[in-house]
């Protein structure tokens, strides 16, 4: 029984000893408001900028009222500021009529774009058969040109082999040089043939024009004779 009693007395002494120490902390009192408005020194460079603005003066008036010395008329926006606020309000908060008009314009523009796109598609679809025909014609002409070039190349190679002999390698420099010469000669002959055909066509056109002029002259002369 002695041990529990001793332990109880020790705990009581510990409680009595630690009690005052646990209550030694005292929180600081809440900050008091200034009884009068605080106006910063404008000449002091350490004064915060926000304390020199009209917003700070409005805050002092709202906190202290008339004793702040701020005229209530200065709290209202000026004419210029009011115009800026109205313009900003019209820009960011337009009226219902303005929004409806803007929506109508957007819908008209979208409808115009849709109609233009549909018209463009219709025009393209109308041109599609002719475009397909032109594409097929161009493809056929390219194929014919390739085949003609192959045949011309084969004829030139055959002619070169006839001149040099079939024992000459077609990949040799001598064979390729002769092939180039034959190609140049053939191109020259084709060019001369085209020029001759153009010249003959021009002469035929001039002769036809002269014959037509003479026929018109004879007709006019015959119509000018007096009838018997």
Swiss-Prot record:
**Ranges of Basic and acidic residues composition bias in the record:** 186-202
Q: Which Pfam families match?
A: CR6_interact
Where does the protein end up? Mitochondrion; Nucleus
Which cellular components does GO assign to this protein? mitochondrion; nucleoplasm; ribonucleoprotein complex; ribosome
Coiled-coil annotated spans? 98-207
Q: Where is the composition biased (Low complexity)?
A: 212-228
User: Among its keywords, does the record have Mitochondrion?
Assistant: yes
Disordered: annotated span: 20-44, 186-228
Q: Tell me which InterPro entries the record gives.
A: Ribosomal_mL64, Ribosomal_mL64_sf
Q: Which UniProt keywords apply?
A: Cell cycle, Coiled coil, Mitochondrion, Nucleus, Ribonucleoprotein, Ribosomal protein
Return the motif ranges for Nuclear localization signal. 184-200
Chain's role: Acts as a negative regulator of G1 to S cell cycle phase progression by inhibiting cyclin-dependent kinases. Inhibitory effects are additive with GADD45 proteins but also occur in the absence of GADD45 proteins. Acts as a repressor of the orphan nuclear receptor NR4A1 by inhibiting AB domain-mediated transcriptional activity. May be involved in the hormone-mediated regulation of NR4A1 transcriptional activity. May play a role in mitochondrial protein synthesis.
Looking up PANTHER family in the UniProt record yields: GROWTH ARREST AND DNA DAMAGE-INDUCIBLE PROTEINS-INTERACTING PROTEIN 1 GADD45GIP1 (PTHR31761), LARGE RIBOSOMAL SUBUNIT PROTEIN ML64 (PTHR31761:SF1)
Q: Which family does it belong to?
A: Belongs to the mitochondrion-specific ribosomal protein mL64 family.
Subunit comment for this entry? Component of the mitochondrial ribosome large subunit (39S) which comprises a 16S rRNA and about 50 distinct proteins. Interacts with GADD45A, GADD45B and GADD45G. Interacts with NR4A1 via the NR4A1 AB domain. Interacts with ATAD3A and ATAD3B.
Q: What is this protein called?
A: Large ribosomal subunit protein mL64
What is the native source organism of this protein? Rattus norvegicus
Q: What is the lineage of its organism?
A: Eukaryota, Metazoa, Chordata, Craniata, Vertebrata
């Amino acid at each position: 029984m002695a041990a529990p009693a001793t332990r109880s007395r020790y705990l009581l002494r510990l409680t009595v000893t630690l009690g005052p120490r646990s209550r030694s902390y005292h929180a600081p009192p809440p900050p008091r408001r200034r009884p009068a408005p605080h106006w910063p020194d404008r000449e002091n460079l350490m004064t915060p900028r926000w304390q020199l603005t009209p917003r700070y003066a409005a805050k002092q008036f709202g906190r202290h009222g008339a004793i702040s010395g701020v005229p209530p008329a200065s709290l209202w926006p000026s004419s210029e500021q009011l115009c800026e606020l109205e313009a900003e309000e019209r820009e960011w908060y337009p009226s219902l009529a303005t929004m409806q008009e803007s929506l109508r314009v957007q819908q008209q523009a979208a409808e115009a774009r849709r109609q233009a796109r549909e018209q463009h598609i219709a025009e393209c679809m109308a041109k599609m058969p002719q475009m397909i025909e032109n594409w097929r014609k161009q493809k056929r002409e390219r194929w014919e040109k390739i085949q003609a070039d192959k045949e011309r190349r084969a004829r030139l190679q055959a002619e070169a082999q006839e001149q040099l002999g079939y024992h000459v390698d077609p990949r040799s420099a001598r064979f390729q040089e002769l092939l180039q010469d034959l190609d140049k000669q053939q191109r020259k002959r084709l060019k001369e043939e085209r020029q001759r055909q153009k010249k003959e066509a021009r002469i035929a056109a001039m002769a036809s024009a002269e014959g037509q002029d003479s026929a018109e002259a004879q007709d006019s002369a015959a119509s000018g004779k007096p009838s018997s």
